[in-house]
Regions:
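Nucleotide and nucleotide-moiety/phosphate-recognizing core
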Residues: 1-110, 120-134, 141-146, 161-192
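Short glycine-enriched, charge-decorated loop/helix-capping segments at active-site entrances
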Residues: 106-112, 151-154
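Hydrophobic alpha-helical segments within soluble ligand-binding/sensing domains
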Residues: 115-118
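A hydrophobic, small-residue-rich beta->alpha segment in the mid-to-C-terminal subdomain
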Residues: 157-158
Length: 192
C-alpha cells in the first residue's frame, strides 16, 4: 500500500461562463464529491482557491478548486501542499483529457502534461510530475486548431451524460485512493 491521497484537486476555470464547459470537469467532480461527503467549500485567498476539509476514517482529505484560471493552477496546489506538508505523491489532480474517449477514465501516477496547461503549471510549481492524475475523457475535436474553443464550450447532451457517468464512477473509487489502494482503484476505474 502506498501513501494515501490527502489532496484532491479539480481543475477548471472560475466564473459562471465556464461552469458547464468540458475544461471544468475537474470542478464537476469536486462539487459532486463535496456534496456526497457533506463538505462545504470556502474561499481561501492564501490558497488561491475554494477549499474544503473532509475528515475521513483514514485521515483528513483536502479538496481544492483553484480560482487562478487553468494556466496558473499550480499556484493553488503548491500553496496548499506546502502549508499542510502534503507530498506530490499524495495529490490527485482531476482533469479533462482530450486524448481519451468521452466517458472513459484513466488513472495514473506521473507522466507528461499532454499539452494541458493546468498540469504543466502544477508540474512546474511542485517541481515534479510525480502526482496522481484522474483523467476524464472528453474526446478530441479532430483538429488541433479547434481545441481551445472545444474545451471552453459545453458538451452535447449525450457527451454531458457520458462525462457525468464517468464522474460518478470516479467518485465511487475515491475512497480506495484515500486508503492508498491504488492497484484496486485502477482495476475498478479502467473496467467498462
Amino acid at each position: 500500500m502506498s501513501n494515501p491521497i490527502k489532496m484532491i484537486v479539480g481543475l477548471g476555470n472560475p466564473g459562471k461562463e465556464y461552469e458547464a464547459t468540458r475544461h471544468n470537469v475537474g470542478f464537476w467532480l469536486l462539487d459532486e464529491l463535496a456534496w456526497q461527503w457533506k463538505a462545504t467549500f470556502k474561499d481561501e485567498k492564501k490558497f488561491f482557491g475554494e477549499v474544503a476539509r473532509v475528515s475521513r476514517p483514514e485521515g483528513d482529505v483536502w479538496l481544492i478548486k483553484p480560482m487562478t484560471f487553468m494556466n496558473r493552477s499550480g499556484q493553488a496546489v503548491a500553496a496548499l501542499a506546502q502549508f499542510y506538508k502534503i507530498k506530490p505523491e499524495e495529490i490527485l489532480v482531476v482533469h479533462d483529457e482530450l486524448d481519451i474517449e468521452c466517458g472513459r477514465i484513466k488513472f495514473k501516477l506521473g507522466g507528461g502534461n499532454g499539452g494541458h496547461n493546468g498540469l504543466k503549471d502544477i508540474q512546474a510549481r511542485l517541481g515534479t510530475p510525480n502526482f496522481y492524475r484522474l483523467r476524464l475523457g472528453i474526446d478530441h475535436p479532430g483538429d488541433k486548431a479547434l481545441v481551445s474553443a472545444y474545451v471552453l464550450n459545453k458538451p452535447s447532451a449525450e457527451h454531458r451524460q457520458l462525462i457525468e457517468d464517468s464522474v460518478n464512477k470516479s467518485i465511487k473509487g475515491i475512497p480506495l485512493l484515500t486508503a492508498g489502494e491504488f492497484e484496486e482503484v485502477q482495476r475498478f476505474l479502467h473496467s467498462r
